[in-house]
Swiss-Prot record:
Gene3D superfamilies: Ribosomal protein L6, alpha-beta domain. It holds the Pfam family Ribosomal_L6. GO terms for cellular component: cytosolic large ribosomal subunit. It comes from the Bacteria. Part of the 50S ribosomal subunit. Signal peptide: none annotated. This protein binds to the 23S rRNA, and is important in its secondary structure. It is located near the subunit interface in the base of the L7/L12 stalk, and near the tRNA binding site of the peptidyltransferase center. Belongs to the universal ribosomal protein uL6 family. This is Large ribosomal subunit protein uL6. One of its GO terms (biological process) is cytoplasmic translation. It comes from Caldicellulosiruptor bescii (strain ATCC BAA-1888 / DSM 6725 / KCTC 15123 / Z-1320) (Anaerocellum thermophilum). SUPFAM superfamilies: Ribosomal protein L6. One of its GO terms (molecular function) is structural constituent of ribosome.
């Protein structure tokens, strides 16, 4: 991971980075993110770049070095561009709709499943088979999208359920019974 950790992070214009001990705050046009990093990692700002250094070449420090650099880079990208995950609802009669701050999913259960929109995340439903999750925190966006997908994971035989838009499903073959469907 040290190759990733060695790369400096450019600070774009309009982004303000503050380092207070082992707490990093990144302010940008889309919002503010704060993260506590490992106390052994050394983070400096030089020539409008964030530089992450490790105290030694131990395996633990090498792994932390790359992780810390990537987490800070994700914060900078989040406050400038933001993150989004697109999910697709596949299946006859399956649909998603937004009611106020709630996402309502009809995915084959006897009742509609309601999911509350958490703080820092926005949900868009451009049509009844697509859900767009947007936010500035990459981890929060990914976790919330995974929770939506978990409501009805894609069926391995038919592909019905909620899947990521870029996810490729490998469908299993059905039973090879006598004279069955071909």
């Amino acid at each position: 991971m040290s190759r990733i950790g060695r790369k400096p992070i450019d600070i774009p214009s309009g982004v303000d980075v503050k380092i207070d001990g082992n707490v990093i705050t990144v302010k940008g046009p889309k919002g503010t993110l704060t993260r506590e990093i490992h106390p052994e990692m050394i983070v400096k700002i030089e020539n409008n770049q964030i530089i992450v250094q490790r105290p030694s070449d131990e395996r633990f420090h090498k792994a932390l070095h790359g992780l810390t650099r990537t987490l800070i880079a994700n914060m900078v990208e989040g406050v400038t561009k933001g993150y989004e995950k697109v999910l697709e609802v596949v299946g006859i009669g399956y649909r998603a709709q937004k009611q106020g701050k709630k996402l309502v999913l009809n995915v084959g259960y006897s009742h509609p499943v309601e999911i509350e929109e958490p703080a820092g995340i926005t949900i868009e439903v451009p049509d009844q088979n697509r859900i767009v999750v947007k936010g500035i925190d990459k981890q929060q966006v990914g976790n919330f999208a995974a929770n939506i997908r978990k409501v009805r994971e894609p069926d391995p035989y038919l592909g019905k359920g909620i899947k990521y838009a870029d996810e490729v499903l490998r469908l299993k073959e059905g039973k090879a019974g006598k004279g069955g469907k071909k």
